[in-house]
């Protein structure tokens, strides 16, 4: 085989000429499948024993269910109910029937078909940090969350395709509680075309949010109830309790065909036993109880199994995340989720107070626990600080770098065939370089991931450019994104109708949360 002599000059000119013809790099981050093999921390027998222990807990110890209607529904389904103690004991045959009817695959409808979210085992969906009372950034500092923060963080969530669902992000505390659901719903519908979130804070707020969403999307009642157009997060009150708004949310969302993501929040050593195995028994049982309630309300109602199990600092009681115990609990949750064979939710996160190396280490370690466990939905994957007390604008951006790189690993790529590889090798002589090779020139603009935040410049160039840290570079990125107008086109009549709805409900006093 004749090996051509490598070119020694003209690289810049050839690249400039190629630039005019090269296509823009396009990778689909919207519908990801987890490419990694799922890890097994425990044997199949150990996981089966944990599942059986959870069923025994539900049968013998039971759950405290604070909502009378939920207790009546459980009783009608065959559970043993102690009204005086508000305790419900759920037979394993009830759980088995619920798991049989709960869908294995849920297609959630967004504003556009290319934003729809498919939840089933093997899929991978990311969400940023959710439900924080505070926001922070390098320019304005840490502060109680506001309506302005909420809208800006919606813009950031909308901007990045690797975030497929909109979470509650921060609490807009300058908006009264009786009006807050109008504000958050309007912001989600006008600033994003992704799957929206609705808090379970009582039937009046949920029903009004459903009405806003249904009318804005142009759905009739039947069309709305036959497909999921939104979701809620259901946190049990561990240990072994479901409170009134959470039980109410499970019922309301199931009855109207909307998705509930069940999430026992079990901190080992605090609201859960201190060992991973015992904590996961509790978490699994609580999730099964909530799933069973949804299926008693409406067989086939969309529901997602979930867990959020980590440990606490036993010196202070403060939650810890991104720990070895958090990782182990995620792996155990993945194995238990495969027993029920339904889509499931896990979480990343960090207890760090600022966007520093601790924050990055904890978030990434927890993220890899979710990925190795095979989680369908990974919540708190970007921006989450202080164990959920704060969402950081800069961390939203720096975490996005990691999520996009993970998404790159999920993307389908066509490998070079062996002959192309041999041709590329034959093009360059021993000791030469591939910068100017034809194989390189045909691919260099689209072959590699382009970093969002990372700076690959050498020290001198980095210094000349201001010696900015990753967080400082992230500030410029988020400011640019939130300064732009949302590039969404909405029907003016629907915007007007929604504004009229909000004005009328506001004049009538809104709707207070229920507890």
What are the functions of these language-model segments?
Residues 141-376:
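Helix-rich catalytic cores of soluble enzyme domains
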Residues 36-39, 315-321, 349-355, 383-395:
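Short beta-alpha connecting loops at secondary-structure transitions
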Residues 2-16, 20-29, 41-51, 61, ...:
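Catalytic-core signal marking the mid-to-C-terminal active-site face
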Residues 1-40, 45-47, 55-59, 65-77, ...:
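N-terminal intrinsically disordered, cationic/polar leader segments
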Residues 369-390:
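Glycine-rich phosphate-binding active-site loops on the catalytic face of alpha/beta enzymes
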Residues 46, 58-65, 78-81, 99-106, ...:
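Structural signal for hydrophobic packing residues in well-ordered secondary-structure cores
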């Amino acid at each position: 085989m004749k090996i051509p002599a490598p070119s020694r000059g003209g690289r810049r000119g050839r690249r400039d000429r190629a630039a005019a013809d090269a296509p823009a790099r396009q990778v689909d981050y919207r519908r990801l499948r987890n490419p990694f093999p799922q890890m097994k921390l425990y044997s199949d027998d150990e996981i089966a024993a944990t599942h059986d222990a959870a069923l025994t807990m539900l049968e013998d110890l039971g759950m405290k269910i604070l909502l009378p209607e939920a207790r009546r529904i459980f009783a009608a389904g065959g559970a043993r109910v102690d009204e005086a103690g508000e305790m419900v004991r759920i037979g394993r045959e009830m759980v088995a029937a619920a798991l049989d009817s709960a869908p294995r695959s849920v297609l959630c409808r967004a504003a556009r078909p290319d934003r729809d979210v498919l939840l089933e085992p093997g899929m991978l969906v990311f969400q940023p940090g959710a439900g924080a009372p505070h926001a922070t950034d390098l320019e304005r500092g840490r502060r109680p969350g506001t309506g302005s923060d909420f809208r800006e963080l919606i813009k950031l969530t909308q901007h990045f395709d690797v975030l497929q669902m909109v979470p509650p992000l921060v609490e807009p505390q300058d908006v009264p509680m009786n009006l807050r659901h109008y504000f958050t719903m309007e912001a989600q519908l006008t600033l994003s075309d992704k799957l929206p979130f609705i808090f379970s804070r009582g039937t009046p707020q949920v029903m009004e949010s459903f009405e806003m969403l249904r009318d804005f999307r142009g759905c009739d009642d039947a069309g709305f109830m036959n497909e999921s157009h939104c979701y809620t997060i259901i946190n049990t009150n561990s240990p072994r309790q479901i409170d009134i708004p959470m039980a109410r949310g499970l019922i309301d969302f199931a009855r109207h065909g909307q998705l509930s993501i069940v999430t026992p929040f079990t901190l080992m050593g605090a609201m859960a036993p201190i060992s991973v195995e015992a904590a996961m028994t509790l978490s699994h049982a609580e999730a099964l109880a909530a799933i069973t309630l949804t299926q008693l309300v409406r067989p086939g109602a969309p529901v997602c199994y979930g867990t959020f199990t980590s440990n606490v600092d036993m010196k202070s009681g403060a939650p810890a995340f991104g720990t070895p115990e958090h990782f182990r609990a995620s792996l155990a949750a993945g194995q238990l989720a495969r027993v029920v064979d339904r889509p499931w939710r896990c979480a990343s996160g960090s207890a760090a107070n600022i966007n520093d190396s601790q924050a990055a280490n904890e978030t990434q370690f927890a993220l890899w626990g979710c990925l190795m466990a095979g989680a369908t939905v990974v919540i708190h994957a970007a921006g989450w600080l202080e164990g959920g007390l704060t969402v950081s604008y800069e961390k939203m951006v720096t975490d996005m770098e990691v999520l996009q790189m993970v998404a790159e690993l999920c993307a389908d790529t066509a490998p070079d065939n062996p002959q192309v590889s041999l041709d590329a090798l034959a093009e360059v002589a021993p000791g030469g370089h591939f910068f100017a090779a034809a194989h390189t020139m045909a691919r260099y603009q689209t072959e590699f991931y382009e970093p969002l935040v990372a700076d690959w410049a050498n020290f001198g160039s980095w210094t000349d450019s201001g010696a900015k840290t990753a967080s400082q570079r992230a500030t410029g990125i988020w400011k640019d994104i939130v300064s732009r107008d949302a590039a969404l086109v909405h029907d003016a009549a629907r915007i007007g109708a929604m504004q009229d709805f909000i004005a009328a409900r506001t004049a009538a006093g809104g709707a207070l949360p229920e507890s």
